[in-house]
Amino acid sequence: MILNTEQIKSVTTGATKVEFKNGRYCFSRFSDAEAKIINHPYVSSPAGIQLKFRTDGHILKLKVYTEKSIEIRSYFSFDIFVDNVLAGTIQNLSDEECIGDYANTNYPLGSFSKEFELKDGDKDINILLPHSLTAYIEEIEIVDSTYIIPIKKEKTILFYGDSITQGFDSLHPSKTYASRLAKALDADIINKAVGGTVFTPELAALPCETKPNYIVVAYGTNDWNSVDLETFKKNAKGFLEGIEKNYSGTPTFVITPLWRPDWREIKKCGEFLNIENSINEIFGNRENITVIPGFELIPHDKSIFGDLILHPNEKGFEHYANNLIKYCLK
């Protein structure tokens, strides 16, 4: 069985739109209005998008295509799970190569294909798309399948944030902090995070297509570099207003910026800890909102960053997620 457009749409989670263009399935996690507000190439990244279904087929054949969203990231992995166990990947970088500053190296892109043998009987398939670049599916075939049934979680987490929440610099989409948190809360992901972005009130003002059960907000490290403190506070307050208007009563976790090696420098927003203090001032003591100190979520060691500067590698995300989950499950 080769999955057709309607079948692929039915098994996709985390996407606002699925289209077949130029021989490829394109997945969008933003509405046209959201993409216009963000206005960044990373909106084409399918971060958090998954294809989840039950089937009785014996072999999964997957054909994919990848290209850079912008020049600085080209690593990727499609992670394939069978009954919640990693069965294989399509990736252009081995796990063993993920040492030092691997994030800024160029890796092969284009068309890739692979077959995955499946165990007998019914099984649940989960295909996680890359977060690091623009990725498409050209074809999915389930050999000897007599049916596919979409799988959806009862709960959903809506993520807002920058490149770290988008997933940089985990090679595997299943090992980002967003994926780890979603697994802990048994929820599907809607990821509205985009690298390089800051608190943007206009984005929060647009209600998500799916009403979430949880919300995660994680901005600040880019704001520190790009706006003054007064503007930062104004933007953060505007973002809060949008969240409270559209998602009143929804448990919301606001994460302050992670530790970074250059945190003692003075940037446009002043001292780095001005950001955390201001977020506590604006979001703290609000009903259904928990402010989480990002500075304490990871070891203060640049070796846990995939670029040795800012973006956690998979070890870094393990620390991040494990500590974050403790706050979210309180």
Where are these regions (language model features)?
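N-terminal secretory targeting modules
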Residues: 1-156, 329
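Serine-esterase "nucleophile elbow" of acetyl-processing enzymes
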Residues: 118-119, 125-211
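Structural motif
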Residues: 127, 216-218, 253
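Short, solvent-exposed loop/turn segments at secondary-structure boundaries
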Residues: 169-173, 194, 227-230, 265-268
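Oxyanion-hole/transition-state-stabilizing segment in secreted/luminal serine hydrolases
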Residues: 198-234, 242, 257-262
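Charged helix-capping and loop-helix junction motifs
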Residues: 231-238, 271-275
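Catalytic His-Asp segment of secreted/periplasmic serine-dependent ester chemistry enzymes
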Residues: 260-330
